[in-house]
């Protein structure tokens, strides 16, 4: 039986980020598996609103790798990038004749993990 692969992974989480899960996942799918520098450049030029909180969580994951594990940022790649559904904020929009329509403002939880490139 082969030896298990041991590696150090640094994680960062962003909780209750405004935005739908599907809109965040379309950005995370493009940066998963890329190097840290390449992902930052891609996020800078993408035209989506969700890139700002994703960049913040990515920088936090790299800072965790530097501080907690002593890893070099130039050798890091993104091996885990997930978005899970968070709680929904319920709001009501007044409508005609005393009615009210419910509006759900969605949030999501972003998790990013980085490892060293081998």
UniProtKB/Swiss-Prot annotation:
Family the UniProt entry places it in: Belongs to the universal ribosomal protein uL22 family.
Function statement: This protein binds specifically to 23S rRNA. The globular domain of the protein is located near the polypeptide exit tunnel on the outside of the subunit, while an extended beta-hairpin is found that lines the wall of the exit tunnel in the center of the 70S ribosome.
Keyword Plastid included in the entry's annotation: yes
Name of protein: Large ribosomal subunit protein uL22c
Superkingdom of this protein's organism: Eukaryota
Lineage: Eukaryota, Sar, Rhizaria, Cercozoa, Imbricatea
Chief site of localization: plastid
HAMAP family: Ribosomal_uL22_B
MF annotations from Gene Ontology: rRNA binding; structural constituent of ribosome
Organism: Paulinella chromatophora
CDD domains linked: Ribosomal_L22 (cd00336)
Subcellular location per the Swiss-Prot or TrEMBL entry: Plastid, Organellar chromatophore
Subunit structure and binding partners: Part of the 50S ribosomal subunit.
One Gene Ontology term, aspect cellular component: organellar chromatophore
Alphabetic keyword roster: Organellar chromatophore, Plastid, Ribonucleoprotein, Ribosomal protein, RNA-binding, rRNA-binding
Gene Ontology biological process terms from the UniProt entry: translation
